[in-house]
């Protein structure tokens, strides 16, 4: 809220296109809500991670995908930044040929839901999915922008035993859980210590991992061989790409290039990042 005048209040908020807007509403329509004091959620559009907090402490981290900013519909697909409340457990819905299960609404058309699936038999006359669910396309995009505006959350349990299904089942009885969507504009990527252990499949693997027993790798190749993050700058490890299942950090040159762009932009403005 910015100011009040004659029964009207001027407010400022992001719209569904992630544009900051101001406008006047009747003061009588504004109510104060105390957010849930047990659980809270942060979705970071830069890291493409969902952070679940309990009583002020980080409980777990999940991979997610927010709205894509590429293509002709980038403004429409952008996930709005700001602070919201989880307001309704709406359940599964169709978005084209994608079935998005366990959806929880937090802002107009924006929902938080399980990573979508494509069903082999499509849907029946009642809108129910038919056949076998294939998550490969959307699951492989976790950790990157990929959605139409919603927040897609990982389906498989992480190392802590959490997934979107855990959120769906355990947060449902809670009221007014705050979800904060952090923007990525003007922010630098975190630099990883070169000595940080990474792992790869020496038998033709194409990705590097944060754990020697990543769930995305077939058991016959486990445990994976150890390298360091610094090794990724030299051959043959410079051919590897980050695994999104275990949340491997971006490659060193990607981080350096992004941060250089941010530094140059701030230099032009005479500011410090």
Explain the meaning of each model-derived region.
Residues 25-72:
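A structural motif detector for short, solvent-exposed N-terminal "entry" segments of globular domains
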Residues 1-27, 232-243:
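SH3/SH3-like beta-barrel superfamily modules
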Residues 41-44, 50-53, 60-62, 85-87, ...:
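Structural recognition of the beta-strand scaffold that forms the well-ordered cores
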Residues 1-6, 10-14, 204-223:
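Beta-loop motif signature
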Residues 20, 77-81, 93-198, 203, ...:
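Exported/periplasmic cell-wall-interacting domains
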Residues 16-19, 56-60, 118-120, 215-217:
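Short, surface-exposed beta-strand-loop junctions and turns on beta-sheet-rich folds
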Residues 40-43, 195-209:
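A short beta-strand micro-motif
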């Amino acid at each position: 809220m910015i100011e009040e005048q004659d029964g009207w209040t001027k407010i400022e908020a992001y719209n569904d296109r992630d544009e900051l807007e101001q406008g006047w509403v009747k003061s009588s329509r504004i109510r104060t809500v105390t957010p849930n004091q047990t659980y809270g959620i942060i979705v970071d559009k830069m890291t493409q991670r969902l952070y679940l907090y309990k009583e002020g402490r980080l409980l777990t981290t999940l991979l997610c995908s927010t709205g894509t900013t590429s293509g002709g519909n980038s403004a429409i697909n952008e996930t709005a930044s700001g602070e919201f409340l989880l307001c309704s457990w709406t359940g599964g819905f169709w978005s084209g040929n994608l079935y998005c299960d366990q959806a929880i609404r937090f802002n107009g058309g924006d929902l938080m839901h399980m990573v979508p699936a494509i069903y082999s038999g499509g849907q029946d006359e009642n809108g129910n999915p038919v056949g076998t669910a294939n998550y490969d396309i959307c699951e492989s995009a976790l950790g990157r922008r990929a959605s139409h505006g919603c927040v897609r959350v990982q389906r498989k349990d992480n190392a802590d035993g959490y997934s979107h299904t855990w959120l769906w089942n355990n947060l449902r009885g809670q009221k007014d859980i705050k979800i904060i969507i952090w923007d990525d504009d003007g922010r630098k990527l975190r630099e990883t210590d070169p000595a940080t252990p990474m792992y790869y499949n020496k038998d033709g693997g194409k990705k590097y991992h944060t754990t020697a027993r990543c769930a995305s790798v077939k058991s016959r190749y486990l445990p994976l061989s150890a390298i360091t993050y610094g090794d990724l700058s030299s051959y043959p490890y410079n051919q590897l790409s980050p695994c999104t299942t275990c949340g491997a950090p971006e490659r060193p040159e990607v981080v350096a290039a992004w941060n250089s762009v941010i530094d140059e932009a701030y230099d032009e403005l005479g500011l410090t990042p």
